[in-house]
């Protein structure tokens, strides 16, 4: 099968990696000349998808279009083109339109009576302030006092377009749902760990959540899917605060990071399932194995004398990445590493029979990198008041 991935940033890296694991050929399209996924694809086209004349011939060479971008103008152009020419596009514009706005998605959560952080002013300090239209940790700020919040308001001129909620302490978790109104399937829960700026630095599988919490998480995800009439895939993120799961955000698109961890832990390939969903009349059948493998998936930044674990933002501007096998003992790495480079970044992918064994392997990989590259300093920052693995 030949697929076209539109967008070569981190979602594009994810889609390309998993498409290759499915045995597919990947044509990558991006308007920028050197996106991260360029080093992973089979063919690259520097094309602006809003220009139909250039883009349509590429579409006709493929059996599936996978959007891996958040530019609304480009997404609208893709949807229009797919409707006009009957092209298979893995995109649900209505669900994405809600999930791409934190204000609209929070309203949906409240309409569905789902547990969410208290909005300000009901929620007390400290608060989290985040832009409605950005995904993940982009633009997220913590406010510890009324004075900080007022200073922020003055700098912005308004609170319009911002979500302001109580700051909750606790571990974060992710779960994907896939399907259509005919039926939905939850996949595997993964555990998320953040850097100091609340950007996800590490994904762990299988989850440390108990069975009752997993079941509750699945119920929440299925309720949202039905509320959206989702057709496609959606990522749901929650935080476990004082024994209760609270919804943080949703994204009705192929996410980055967690799909690879789920694939390596369970063998479930979300990109392959998307292909089945958009090319066959019935929903794909999915079953999780009884004994998933342990996975550690994390990002690191190397500089002279120092190795630092960091959020995925470090990968976005690293230029074309490539896939290395047996990278300092890791199963795989997606990286711009070269032996002569003093500064480089990598996403480490490490598996074992269990999560505990995968973590032990990961610590050995970190030590091997530090020894081989003469790095005496090691940092693994986390948000204040959050647990973290500080030592390898």
Name what the model sees in each region.
Residues 1-91, 354, 360-381, 390-391:
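ATP-binding N-terminal substructure of ATP-dependent carboxylate-amine bond-forming enzymes
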Residues 275-392:
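Peripheral (often C-terminal) accessory segments that flank ATP-dependent C-N-forming ligase machineries
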Residues 96-171, 180-186, 202-223, 362, ...:
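Active-site nucleotide/adenylate-binding loops and adjacent lid/helix of ATP-dependent enzymes
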Residues 230-242, 380-382:
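A short glycine-rich, hydrophobically flanked beta-strand micro-motif that places a catalytic Asp/Glu
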Residues 166-229, 240, 251-278, 290, ...:
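ATP-dependent carboxylate/phosphate-activation module, predominantly the ATP-grasp catalytic core
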Residues 63-64, 189, 342:
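Structural motif
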Residues 244-246:
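Conserved protein kinase catalytic/activation segment
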Residues 37-40, 55-57, 97-104, 197-199, ...:
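Short, charged, surface-exposed secondary-structure boundary motifs
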